[in-house]
Amino acid sequence: MKYAFETLSEDDFEKLVVKICQSLMGIGIHSFSKGRDGGRDGYFEGAAQKYPSTQTPWQGKFIIQAKHTTNVMASCADNEFFSNKTSVINKEIDRLKGVASQYPFDCYLMFTNRPLSGVVHPKIKKHLEKELNISYADIIGQEDLERYVDDCSELITQFHLLKYMLPDRFYEQDIRDVIVLFSQQNDDWLNKKEENEDSDDNSLTYADKVEKNRLNN
């Protein structure tokens, strides 16, 4: 099920991430707090209960981050999020290197409500592990967020996510396709009419505004 996470406030998104992490790792996770460097990090120390799995859980000191966006068109493949030197991820890497110099950590996990494709995911994961010099780093995108919420019905209630459930969206190209389809269908009917004047006339007809108003009334 799709949820409009972009409509949540930044604080509520962070609280949602904490609840998910409590399910994945344990209740010992510390909520997001603002450090001296301006970053907002969540913390956990120990062995995760079931991340990435119960058979091979991560363990050690964790730093967890939530990166929220209100832009429905944003994705993890955007240059401003990953590729650029000043991208969101590269800025965080620079900041976290400073954190690690004083408070070393073993695992890093970023949550975002941006869509995360199978193409860019391994690139970001590898980049984080290399630049942070740790063995365990990953990013969780919109798709996995939706799966975690689906598995935890209490999150749907607590964060009122049903009212944010996305309806089907129609775009300009969809409307154009429908218009073209009706136009082609009408042309077919008109051609059949010309071939057989005695047939029933089921074609679409056009009327000027005056005649249209008379027919509608």
Spans of model-derived segments:
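Mixed-charge (Asp/Glu-Lys/Arg
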Residues: 1-217
